[in-house]
Amino acid sequence: MKVLLINGSPHKEGNTFIALSEVAKALEKESIQVEMIHIGSKAVQGCIACYKCFELGKCIFQDDLYNKIRESLTNTDGIIIGTPVYYAGPNGSLCAILDRIFYSCSHLLQYKPAASVAVCRRGGASAAFDRLNKYFTISNMPVVSSQYWNSVHGLSPGEALKDAEGLQIMRTLGRNMAWVLKNLKSNTELIPMPEERQSTNFIR
């Protein structure tokens, strides 16, 4: 079994990396493979609502980051997304790539356990955490929890190492993800068959 970790920070080895690495160590102790993808610091193309992904089965913008994540999703069993907190929300570049991934790759995501992690200096983590969870809860994905909301605190690179409670929350998240994955693996025949999708709006 394998879990994809997405580091949504522009800083490759900053506090978001520290938080996700703590989750990764807990997963590996449970014999779960991990892969971490860093979104980097380059500009990320957002969704333009062209709906070409409905025809192509993938986003019309074929950049390296999108292709790398999409390819990884074909052989992962779970996903954990980490972000720094900007104005009580996730990194905008992370949301740009997630909008495209979740809209064009829903068939690669449904029924895979997922979790989000927010890293902040002081406040805004819960709002960013909730925002990321919206991707999962609209995609038929079980959301894995921990002993507290999944946040770690730190400003300068490395400060997250001082957040003993935050790091414990990350380890608990890793163990809980492993537990969910193992239970799903032994009960794959119980995964529900979705109904045909209905789409309505509020205009009469």
Regions found by a protein language model. Give the residues of each.
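Generic secondary-structure signature for well-ordered alpha-helical cores
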Residues: 25-32, 78, 102-106, 137-141, ...
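Cysteine-cluster motifs in flexible loop/terminal segments that predominantly coordinate metals
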Residues: 42-73, 199-204
